[in-house]
């Protein structure tokens, strides 16, 4: 049975400032760096064989810390990027106009066909996240990969694995450097395919985390 660990990146400057990130970027805060070290210590003896990260800076910074702890080299996969938030990227949440806030609400509430101008739909996000996860099936037998990605991206992936709509990710709280695990099982008596073993585990973090204020 293939086990795949999923980690959200550490807290960033824009998380703390309530600024929309999407596929724009900001570095980890000191808290975010500590979170990354803590999750690295959590997984370092789990037999991880591959560290695969979104190619955005905040995930690479997190993944590098984990890779160093595991004695591995990190590789990147752009399919693990966060949702493209289009014209709202790099905007403080409190600065959105009523029209822009309506775009955001339609997106997160699952309005059919919702998309922020110049951005990406939740359906498109789910499709590429599933493709990134499925590519783990091509790794050598005995592999145990760890993927480093983003809050909405991982929430969308986990929601849709359960057969829920992509926007159900609103109902999953995946805090910075939380740890999730999905397994691929083939069984004549259990559901075959991807199953969720755990989601949003923060037992390794030793400090209160910011809530996902931008969400």
Swiss-Prot record:
Main EC class the enzyme belongs to: isomerase
Lineage: Bacteria, Pseudomonadati, Pseudomonadota, Gammaproteobacteria, Enterobacterales
Stated name of the protein: Probable phosphoglycerate mutase GpmB
Catalyses which reaction(s): (2R)-2-phosphoglycerate = (2R)-3-phosphoglycerate
UniProt keyword annotations, A-Z: Glycolysis, Isomerase
Positions bound to substrate: 8-15, 21-22, 58, 82-85, 151-152
GO CC annotation, single: cytoplasm
Organism per entry: Yersinia pestis
Signal peptide range in chain numbering: none
EC number(s) reported in the record: 5.4.2.-
